[in-house]
């Protein structure tokens, strides 16, 4: 049985966000931590922390403005059955720059803006708006 851990992460965030939960907990991985760093840097989550010794857990503290959700939507783009790769010219712009695309490049995981600035293409992991 194969599970898409990034899709699972996005689904957990989406579900907790819809229910206005303060935080969401999930199994940790290096890729998930890097995505959490990007979400924090871009202002979509308040904070995150990794805890545990053997089985590490990633806890994201979600961000709200009153009762308004900061994250309007999350969408997994590249899936295990259908990978989506783009060149630097094809790097997508989410909602005319109002959202972000998370891209895995040979220099690491970064936003669409950082990938364009570094003149890199790669695998489009997800859209966040």
Curated annotation (Swiss-Prot):
Belongs to the universal ribosomal protein uS8 family. Part of the 30S ribosomal subunit. Contacts proteins S5 and S12. It comes from the Bacteria. One of its GO terms (cellular component) is ribonucleoprotein complex. The keyword RNA-binding applies. One of the primary rRNA binding proteins, it binds directly to 16S rRNA central domain where it helps coordinate assembly of the platform of the 30S subunit. Keywords: Ribonucleoprotein, Ribosomal protein, RNA-binding, rRNA-binding. The lineage of its organism: Bacteria, Bacillati, Mycoplasmatota, Mollicutes, Entomoplasmatales. GO terms for biological process: translation. GO terms for molecular function: rRNA binding; structural constituent of ribosome. This is Small ribosomal subunit protein uS8. SUPFAM superfamilies: Ribosomal protein S8.
């Amino acid at each position: 049985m194969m599970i898409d851990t990034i899709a699972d992460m996005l689904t957990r965030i989406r579900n907790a966000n819809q229910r206005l939960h303060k935080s969401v907990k999930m199994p940790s991985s290096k890729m998930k931590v890097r995505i959490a760093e990007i979400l924090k840097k871009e202002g979509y989550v308040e904070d995150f922390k990794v805890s545990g010794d053997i089985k590490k857990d990633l806890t994201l503290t979600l961000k709200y403005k009153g009762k308004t959700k900061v994250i309007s939507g999350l969408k997994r783009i590249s899936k295990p059955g259908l990978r989506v790769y783009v060149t630097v010219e094809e790097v997508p712009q989410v909602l005319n720059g109002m959202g972000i695309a998370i891209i895995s490049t040979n220099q690491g995981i970064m936003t669409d803006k950082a990938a364009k600035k570094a003149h890199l293409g790669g695998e489009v992991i997800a859209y966040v708006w």
